[in-house]
C-alpha cells in the first residue's frame, strides 16, 4: 500500500516507513517493560501484568480504524478496470510467478536472520558464552534499535536517489564483511565493545537492508499479484531464516564448544543467498510482466 500510493520518485522513502515498525515496536516494548519495573513483585503479579495487554488493545483498534478507511490503490484500480485481476491469485502466483516468489524469499533471508542474531541471539551469547551482564546486552540492543529506527527512513529516502538494488547490494556486502568484526568486538568483553558491535551491525548496516526490502519486492511483482507474491516470499524467507536463526546459532555454539566461527559461516551463507537473489532480481528487470506493470504505473 505504501509503495503503490507513493509518488514515483518517493517510493523508496514511503516504502521504508512500514519497515520501521519492527524497531519502533521493540522500543515501545522496552518502554513498557521499563514501566513495569516501577511495581513491586506483588503488585505486578496481582494486576500489573495486565497493563501491557490493555495498552496493546489500543494498537489493535488503531489498526482496525486505519484498515477501515483504506481504499484500493490506484495501481490495483487500474488492473481491476482493465479486467486483469487474478481470479485465483495464489494459484496464479505459484504457477506463473514462482521465480519471483523465490527471489523475494531470498531477499528476505539476509534481512531476517541477522535481525534475530543481532537483536535476540546476542543477548544469550553475550550473557552465557561471554561474561556480559544482561543489562549491558539489552541496553546495546535498545540503542541499536533506536539508531535503526532513525536510519530506516533516511536510507529509504536515499534509495530514491541511488537506487534500491545498489543500496541493497552494498548494504548486504558490508553486512557480510562485518560478521567477523562483530564477533571480535563482542569477544573484547567490554561495554563499549558490545555497544559498538550492535550499533554498527543492527543500527547502521541492517537498517538499509530492511529499508529497501519492501519496495524492492514490490518492484518484482506485477500489480495483479503483488500482494500475494510479496506475502508468499516474505513468509517463506522468514520461515526458513527468521525465528530459526537463534536456534541454529545456539545449536552451532553448543556443537562446537562455544566457537563463534560456525555461526559466522551460517551468517555468511545468508548473505550469499541474498546476493544471489538480488542478482537474479536485476536480471529480471526487463521481464514482460514487470515491465508492463511499470509502464501502467508511469
Regions found by a protein language model. Name each.
Residues 63-70, 216, 268-297:
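Multi-pass alpha-helical transporter architecture, strongest
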